[in-house]
């Protein structure tokens, strides 16, 4: 029996969905749809259009459904570091900031006046870059950003898209590691860093690792696409993990 898997692969300039099928000859891959990913510039800031990305994913699922294939599971990967602020009602508070936004220039240096650079690197083990989520969040906090102040949850990009498909909020390990918030030894979010930027573990979804089930497609997505309750599985959500 053939097993078909639906992959969503999103980069900073374009995205695609792919149908991968295991046959007696091995893995066969077919591109379902391909689409651009554009930045939105508003008020000298840069944002991603997550609703447009969702629309393209839904279209890919509809095409796959029309092919009559039975999809075993769905997985999503994206670029790293960017995230969505989610309100208490479960809605997105605004479009996600892009890592290309210049508002984080000088942010690491400002942060290291409070926690030494050596401590941050010792905990996280990743390269210090001004657009890492840690510094994005600290910049938003220092600027009294209204969306962050009102946020009940923060979802990284692949987790936000899986939430739109399933209604389940998770934090996948590989994408979270790009944030410079994950302790490389414990493989969990580092409380000392969260505390410094005014956040807690409760601001993040259930921590999951690649291979774990996130949830099935919501009834709404099933109706729109013509698919059943196909499971969405946590994959290595960072596209270069």
Mark where each language-model region is.
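A charged helix-plus-loop insertion that forms the helical arch/lid used to bind
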Residues: 90-103, 177-181
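Acidic/polar active-site rim loop that often engages polyanionic ligands
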Residues: 86-93, 114-124, 137-140
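N-terminal glycine/serine-rich phosphate-binding loop of ATP-dependent small-molecule kinases
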Residues: 1-94, 122, 216-232
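Gly/Ser/Thr-rich active-site cleft segment
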Residues: 10-12, 121-240
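Residue-level signal for inorganic ion chemistry
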Residues: 49, 74, 101, 140, ...
